[in-house]
Amino acid sequence: GYFYLRAVLTQKKIIKLRMPVMSIKTILLVLGLILSNTVCAFAKDGTIDTGDTAWVTMSTALVMMMTPAGLALFYGGMSRYKNLLNTIAMTLVAYCLASIVWVGWGYSLAFGESSSLFVGNLNHLFLNGIDVDSITGTIPTIIFVLFQMTFACISVAIILGSVVDRMKFSSWIIFTILWITFAYAPVCNWAWGGGWMHKIGALDFAGGNVVHINAGVSGLVLALFLGKRKGYGKEAMIPSSVTFTALGAGFLWFGWFGFNAGSALAADGIAASAFLVTNTAAAMGGLAWLFVEWKHSKKPTLLGLASGAIAGL
């Protein structure tokens, strides 16, 4: 609407005020345009859902915390004191390297469209073709890239537990780059990028195959290849800080809500169900380990409780 004020001063006369009234047709036309634009903003297919975007963004931050905070403290606390700082440093450098590799070529190999059923292409090298307007599902593609990046980071960091005290820092750097490129990205493509596992209907909701089996098998192979730690079976392998391990388990437990519930890529009932199951599994795992250890050794330990919770997750 609008109005204007016209004042006319005449000889000893009052100010006259005139206010034109908009026609009914004009008012209806303006309201119609406003309502139609409002409806279109919510009805278009392929548009960004702010609720889903906010949830996946928060989940990305939660999963990110699992590596430089959760695993760093969890593994660092269980390692011998002389390896504490080195273990934490290896966790942090794994996160940094995996982040760069993922943005550079890892994402493209994992999610790039390709006729091959085993690996993607390099069309999205250094995120080529992805901008602020790109959408995956109901969230910005950039957020999807970051969420998947945190999965790649924690996957390679999980392997670190198999090589603590047995692998040089420089060798770990090389391994991280090669593993993300030739192990993680292809397996990710198989399950989530339209590869052969996806084609046969395999369901990997939150990384059971891509993350845990992949990292677990790789860690086993590395442990067998490197052999036992020096002094194993002869010297006491005393954890440097059980407190660190317990704190790390807490960070991992907290971050795992984003890991599992965030994998729904939406703020919906599936995410809520995953959230509930995640917490229940961790709690049950911790209690089961605690009571079994209590019965077996007549004494429960904080290390056992923390280990059980992570095993449940």
Model-assigned labels for residue ranges:
Residues 10-28:
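Bacterial N-terminal signal peptides that target proteins for export
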Residues 2-4, 42:
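Aromatic (phenylalanine/tyrosine) cluster motif
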Residues 2, 12-13, 35:
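Intrinsically disordered, low-complexity peptide-like regions
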Residues 23-313:
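Hydrophobic alpha-helical transmembrane bundles of multi-pass membrane proteins
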